Each structure stands twice: as structure tokens, then as C-alpha cells.
């Protein structure tokens, strides 16, 4: 059972019995109580969610800390395959996507995200050292909503994140 199905079942049970305990939900749904607790916490987290897909751990960690300090819920993925998987399971509000990664590069990740009906509406900001005009054009033509080159100004990146989230809500 995936997270969305689990969430739907939990909400259905809570609608039937608002006083039910986590233990009661775990018994009814035949799952470990830790799974119930994780889904309940997830349901109550209303912060905007950002998925960062980057194989450079130091850069990812620094950016994660900076965005979390602004109140974002930040999820991380270290390669393209994990990025697609987390996009499906976590449904972020925006994805920050590096291009140069092993296994599957960011262009291919973006193409797959934008061709998946479940994920195509999630804004993607390419965040990469590839700053040539042809790279920018390719990223934007793949469906990226914005393109920021490394090194970047954190204040500008935060403004761009707010902008794509705002455009996506309207």
C-alpha cells in the first residue's frame, strides 16, 4: 500500500470515528503504529515542500538548512531515480533539480516528471553549474519552470522559489 492509499484509509477511519487512537488505526489497517504516526505527522505538516535533487551532498545540505530556516519542509534525493520516486511519494510544491548527476541526468528527470500526469504540474527549477545558453534553453524546453546557475545568490533563489510556487497556486 502506498502513502496516498494509506492516507486515504486513515482519513476515512478518522471521519467515521474522530476519537480513534493511533493504536486503533494501526489495528484496523493492519499496519505498524509507526506507519500511522508518520502519516499523521505528514498530514499535519502544512509547510510548503521542496524536493532538492542533487548528488553533491555538501551543496544539498547547505541549501536544505537555508530553506528549512525559512520554514520550508525540505526533502532530499541524491540521484535522478530517487528524485522521481520521492516526487511521486511526497508530492512536493517545487523541485530544485541539478543536471549533472550519475545514472540519470537532470534533463531526463525533468522530461520524465513533465510527461507523468501525476507529476507534470509540479514546478521544476533547474539548479546547476551548466550555464551555457544551449543548456538553459534545453532545460526550459524540457519543461523546467526556471533555470538558476551555480554559484547562485541564495536571496535570488528564494525569491524564484516563492515565485514559481505562487504561479502554481493561481
PLM features: residue spans?
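Short amphipathic alpha-helix used as the core "switch/output" element in two-component signaling
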Residues: 85, 107-120
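Alpha4 helix (beta4-alpha4-beta5 surface) of REC/receiver domains from two-component response regulators
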Residues: 5-8, 108, 131-148
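Active-site residues of response regulator receiver
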Residues: 54, 98, 128
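Helix N-cap/capping motif at the beta->alpha junctions
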Residues: 76-85, 106
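C-terminal output helix
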Residues: 152-162
Amino acid at each position: 500500500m502506498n502513502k496516498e492509499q494509506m492516507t486515504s484509509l486513515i482519513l476515512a477511519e478518522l471521519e467515521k470515528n474522530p476519537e480513534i487512537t493511533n493504536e486503533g488505526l494501526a489495528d484496523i489497517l493492519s499496519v505498524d503504529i509507526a506507519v500511522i504516526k508518520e502519516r499523521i505527522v505528514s498530514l499535519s505538516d502544512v509547510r510548503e515542500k521542496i524536493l532538492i535533487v542533487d548528488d553533491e551532498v555538501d551543496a544539498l545540505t547547505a541549501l536544505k538548512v537555508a530553506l528549512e530556516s525559512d520554514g520550508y519542509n525540505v526533502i532530499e534525493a541524491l540521484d535522478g531515480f530517487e528524485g522521481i520516486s520521492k516526487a511521486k511519494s511526497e508530492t512536493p510544491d517545487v523541485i530544485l533539480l541539478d543536471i549533472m548527476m550519475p545514472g540519470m541526468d537532470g534533463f531526463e528527470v525533468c522530461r520524465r516528471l513533465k510527461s507523468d500526469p501525476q507529476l507534470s504540474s509540479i514546478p521544476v527549477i533547474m539548479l546547476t553549474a551548466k550555464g551555457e545558453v544551449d543548456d538553459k534553453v534545453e532545460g526550459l524546453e524540457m519543461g523546467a519552470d526556471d533555470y538558476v546557475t551555480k554559484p547562485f545568490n541564495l536571496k535570488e533563489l528564494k525569491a524564484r522559489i516563492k515565485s514559481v510556487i505562487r504561479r502554481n497556486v493561481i
